[in-house]
């Protein structure tokens, strides 16, 4: 799972950074132009619906604070997972770079291998680094696979899923509702496998997965798959003996990060909502956003570029003034996604200068 330095630096090529920007803005721009032509409204009237008021400024400022809350949650999570051996500033650098690599990779790929590499360069053993990354993946999976149904305790499930019934995806050849259940089912299967491999029967899962990967049909993925299987077993040794207080703290930090992430979108909606949003509206927006994040897992584009913006317009069109849903989607991504593409380069330059040449043979914490 550990990346090489050369592979890491390749991620910072101009092409890798520009690709998600071009894809996202290109798809949205084309769709936005089509909707504008279809509506027949003068461009001036459409732009007037984005009138900035004191209310808009307040909510957008709050959205920026929610992004800070999100990053703080992940920094706190990383501090807990490393037994507070990493400084806050180091945690911030790792989180920002982790987000950068997630932004330039398809959602299903993410930046796990790069995250392990960065932690190893911070003098954390490969075993502990692997355990940390698998723990974050596990907690994220638990959070956003369960949230749509937790939200349905407060908001009718029919209201949460209503827009998906009428959206057809040419990529899937069917409704987005089917796409959601396919993505959710795959994530649940993956989550169950993680629980079994990390906590319930790590040696049994290791044995079966190793033999499965020996089949001829998996020969192209065998080498990488065997590394992953061994990484899971290593991580399980580190995690199974953790006390309840550890899991409570790391879950609170994870929840804080995801709540901050979700409330960014709520703030963007509230900034330009035709009428003030009620508590029910905010809960409904959270429920639909949980659906959106799962649908985004299907995206083959870097950082779900294009898919995230279109999904926003499909799911939240009834929250926004007519004709401006895609514009709000772009604003949402300008706050929550594109900054990481910009921040990544200077942060990486600083990080490489600080850690390059570190002796990883003397780990600061962790297991071998």
Annotate each PLM feature.
Residues 94-100, 206-232:
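Juxtamembrane inter-helical linkers in multi-pass membrane proteins
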Residues 13-19, 52-62, 237-251:
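Membrane-interface helix starts
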Residues 73-78, 115, 261-268, 291, ...:
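Hydrophobic/aromatic residues in alpha-helical transmembrane segments
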